[in-house]
C-alpha cells in the first residue's frame, strides 16, 4: 500500500533480526532502521548474512553499537566494529552507518571521534 502511493517504508528493529531475516525481507520495506550488531545476549549478528538477505532490497541504518562499543569499548573495539559494519554491509550501497540507537550524553566524545576516523579510513568500499 505504501509503495502504491510512491512512498518508501522503514521499519525499526534493533535486535532479534536473525531469526526473522527472511520474513523481514518478504515484508518488502525499504529501510531497516537501527540494526544493532550486538544482540542483548552479547552475541554478534552475522552482518554478511544480513547483507546477503537485504542486498538491493533493504537499506540499513545502524551497524554501530552504542552502549557497549561506543560507551565502553576500547579504541580498537570501536575501530573494528566500524570496519566490520562497513565491509559487511556497505558494498553495493545501502548502508548509513549510525550508532544504535543514538549517541548518549554518557558516551565519551573521543569514542565518537574514533568511530568517525575509522569510518573515513574504510568508507571507500567497492
Task: List where the protein language model places each region.
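Active-site loop segments of alpha/beta catalytic cores
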Residues: 1-126
Amino acid at each position: 500500500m505504501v509503495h502504491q502511493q510512491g512512498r518508501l517504508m522503514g521499519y525499526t528493529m534493533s535486535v532479534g533480526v536473525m531469526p526473522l531475516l527472511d520474513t523481514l525481507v518478504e515484508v518488502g520495506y525499504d529501510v531497516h532502521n537501527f540494526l544493532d550488531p550486538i544482540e542483548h545476549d552479547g552475541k554478534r549478528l552475522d552482518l554478511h548474512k544480513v547483507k546477503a538477505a537485504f542486498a538491493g532490497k533493504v537499506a540499513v541504518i545502524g551497524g554501530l553499537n552504542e552502549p557497549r562499543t561506543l560507551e565502553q569499548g576500547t579504541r580498537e573495539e570501536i575501530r573494528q566494529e566500524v570496519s566490520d559494519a562497513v565491509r559487511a554491509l556497505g558494498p553495493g550501497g545501502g548502508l548509513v552507518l549510525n550508532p544504535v540507537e543514538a549517541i548518549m550524553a554518557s558516551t565519551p566524545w573521543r569514542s565518537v571521534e574514533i568511530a568517525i576516523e575509522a569510518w573515513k579510513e574504510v568508507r571507500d568500499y567497492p
